Amino acid sequence: VRLRLPAGLVSLLLAALYRLVLLTVRLRVENYDALRALWAAGTPTVVACWHNELFCFPALRGDTRWVAIVSASRDGEVLARVLNRLGVDTARGSSSRQGLAALRQAVRAMREGAGRVNGFVTVDGPRGPRHKAKDGVLLLAALAGAPLVPARVRCSRAFVFRKAWDRFELPLPFSTCRIVFGRPYAVPSGALRGQALADAVRELEARLHGLG
């Protein structure tokens, strides 16, 4: 018999585990000043990372408030509740379900936040392929008029879930994790269709791999 626990209980346990692990992990953040300068000027940003490296980002909520686009699936429901418990806002949708509504919700939150609310997207989620970016993050950045910021995480020691599609990385206790932000760059509205959009996706992938 397969036991399915309520999403609320699962999210409570996972949020508690997150806080416990984070107490033992040393975080180092690189190239963060450029983002802070944009936020201070009232300019929101959209941070783009790979799905397997998302663990450390909610820890940065003290400097800003994040709005993350999360899948509308049941697994996404659990993740959204975990993020909410950690102080991260969520817009529900994905590449296949309710994506446009989620984009609009995130854009509205970022515009109203004027630099105090910033977007966060795992660009190869929610189902992969691993390290292959989708175009949703580009649409979000262009519609919100927000610079796009590629970001990577490198941990000295981590447990890798090798059977997961993304090979998710969970930092081990007493490891050091580097959050590395790339240079913010603009996504022109003209890059939202056709070959220009495909080229913009490849550019984002190259920038992410270049951090890594």
PLM ranges: what are they?
Residues 84-87, 109-110, 166-172:
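Short, hinge-like loop/turn segments at secondary-structure boundaries
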Residues 134-192:
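A cross-family acyltransferase "interaction/gating" segment
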Residues 1-63, 88, 107, 203-212:
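Membrane-anchoring hydrophobic helices of lipid-metabolizing enzymes
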